[in-house]
Amino acid sequence: MNDTVAGVIAKALARHGVEIIFGQSNPSALMLAAEDIGIRQILFRTENAGGVMADGYSRITNKISVIAVQNGPAATLAVAPMAEAIKASIPMLVLVQDVPTHARDRNGFQEFDHLALFASVSKWTRTIDDPARVDDYVDLAMMVANGGRPGPVVLLLPKNVLDLEAHPAKLPRTANLGSFPLDRPRPCAQAVAKAAGLIAMARAPVVIAGGGVHVSGAVQALVRLSDRAHLPVATTNMGKGAIDETAALSLGVVANITGRSGPAFYTRDLIADADVVLLIGNRTNENGTEGWSLTKPDAIYIHIDIDPCEIGRNYEAVRLLGDARAALDDLTIALEGLDLASRAAARPALEARIA
């Protein structure tokens, strides 16, 4: 006998490395099927709390988190943590029990337009209503959530469809797509060479690292680049921790705390003096740039990001489109072939100024 749709979803989640689901026992058919194969449920009291739990789990494990919620009012409570996750580039799979297909568009119990509800906080929202395509949709959800710039996705699960017999896949699937970054694309070699040349020739270059450094797992790559090219590193609030804040070349957290009464006021001049600014996984948002006033308008910008729409959004830049860790590794290698004597000579005075 074939599995039910709920059973196939549970097995697909397990194949992608899912070990826990944050939930409240809904959808019941799915939660029972998941329990049967060893996927644990971690309970939450409210969906907004469950979403925060899921977000934290993803950040710690570099695996997609899964949260299951009921339709309607319960689903609305998942919006706030999803909004945080999509801005912070954190993958999350939200499974929403929906009204049965025969009740759709008939004012079924707690029926809600979930496509409209999640439009601004989900990378991708789909309904599983074809028992022959369950694996397709679970795999697509994983690819969209963990691929490119990670973020939340939603699968809507009509209650009656979960109990239907699912058609077996024609070929067994073995791919595990449940961790991120799913891929590590590298930037164009010519752009990397150009960026390396600009850094080598710069009078006062600076790095401003954003949250993308953490998402990419690029902390060590950033440390290597900073040490090799003698680059001072500041971070945004989301990038905090990307470099040891007691390190000799660390400028700490900057952005909206560099005002006259802010704790980072005394690093402001170092940022403002930069002639080359390397942005890494940095959305250059208002808070992260103190209203786009932190750096000189005529500075040269180099921007590493996985999202092509973020590069050049606020500052025209040399485009290093790709995974942050891969890009930093390539940039460090490119710099090894260049003369960095002037950067090395300037380092003692720079460290003294930072101290």
Regions found by a protein language model. Name each.
Residues 1-4, 132, 298-355:
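Phosphate/pyrophosphate-binding active-site segments
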Residues 24-26, 42-52, 67-74, 129-131, ...:
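Active-site nucleophile and cofactor-binding loops and adjacent substrate-binding regions
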Residues 37-68, 124-126, 248-270:
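Glycine-rich oxoanion-binding loops at beta->alpha junctions
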